[in-house]
Amino acid sequence: MLDPRHVAEHLDEVRAALALRSPAAAASLGDDFASTVSARRSNIQELERWQAERNAANEAMARLDKKSPEFAQKRDELKALSTRIKEAEQVVSELEKRMTELLSVVPNLPDPSVPVGAGEEGNVVVRAWGEKPSFSFAPKSHWDIGTALGLLDFERAAKLSGARFTVLMGAAARLERALISFMLDLHTREQGYLEVLPPFLVKDTALFGTGNLPKFAEDLFKTQKSDPERAYDLYLIPTAEVPVTNLHADEILDGASLPIAYAAYTPCFRSEAGSHGRDVRGLIRQHQFDKVELVRFSAPEDSARQHELLTSHAEEVLKRLGLHYRVSALCTGDLGFGSQKTYDLEVWLPGQGVYREISSCSNFGDFQARRAQIRYRPEPKAKPRLVHTMNGSALAVGRTVIAILEQYQQADGTVVVPEPLRAFMGCEVLRGR
């Protein structure tokens, strides 16, 4: 969430920055907010005037005889002022609550380094690694490869759960498991992350903290309450970002402990409410998928460097697996709701002839930290400050399976196993289950 005080004091400037995202983003900070800010300012001025009158009345009473009529009169005036002050404080509190509610659906401000653009076409490719694999045959899509080898069963998945689910069979299931282990080992043993295995169900407060609620409720799977005494709702996590970021919600961290780096494997669950008719074939867009997530917490002055470091850690997975990819800096119009800067890692899929996102590495600045109240103390007696948070997939496991099937396919329909995974898999080539 944006800083309410900063927005109130620089409303036109903030709207201009939001307009770089889209007209809708600028409109999200509407006239309601401006009028609420104005009402708060007026009430604070009135409150301060009454507080000054109360202080003056207290000073006057101190000079009066407690048995005099004047003392009794001042005492009555003081009681009336105290009542007014209490009422005014309540009004200010309600107005500040309203400001927070209005800001809860306003996206983050783009970092000045983000390219300006209206949508995906405005993204800028900043680097690429490796070469597109060449084939002596027409490369197939992963769904054709997986089906022919008996590794991907879409029909039985539909029988079990409906559309956008897949059953991985035999070697495909082992490949998924091998990738999870390979990614976690790389991140924890070589890159310094602490492995976390969080709950896959979270409270609505956690989803508010990361910015998923209230704006993106339709993309979440909400459970039904079996216990009427439970005071909160539980949701299936859309990403490990949610529970891992909220590990430190409502905490004040020791500045000496920063940066903090976590790696977590979880299944993820998304309703894909806004993607009807898109990517209906294969593993690209599923209701349930596996992901290894990196989350970092840093001091503001180290934020940009930590974001670049996290991105390089996600890239290293692709490099080790020998998968050709490129890195795109998202433009202002394509940024996610809470992000101030994002790099997308896009892997080449020769069977489809396209690059597809396999990781989004985002810096949120203090946007999530303000919502979740994650702070740190730079020095032992210093005033707490908001941390900066950043995260990225490293990687989306199902999409990594897709990339391996398509980039490592052979003319006979088999698939070469990338060298780093062979010890996990116990084979060099996928020939079937």
Curated annotation (Swiss-Prot):
It comes from the Bacteria. Keywords: Aminoacyl-tRNA synthetase, ATP-binding, Cytoplasm, Ligase, Nucleotide-binding, Protein biosynthesis. SUPFAM superfamilies: Class II aaRS and biotin synthetases, tRNA-binding arm. It is found in: Cytoplasm. ATP binds at R270, S271, E272, E357, I358, S359, S360. One of its GO terms (cellular component) is cytoplasm. CDD domains: SerRS_core. It is an enzyme of class 6 (ligase). The keyword ATP-binding applies. Pathway: Aminoacyl-tRNA biosynthesis; selenocysteinyl-tRNA(Sec) biosynthesis; L-seryl-tRNA(Sec) from L-serine and tRNA(Sec): step 1/1. Belongs to the class-II aminoacyl-tRNA synthetase family. Type-1 seryl-tRNA synthetase subfamily. Consists of two distinct domains, a catalytic core and a N-terminal extension that is involved in tRNA binding. NCBIfam families: serS. This is Serine--tRNA ligase.
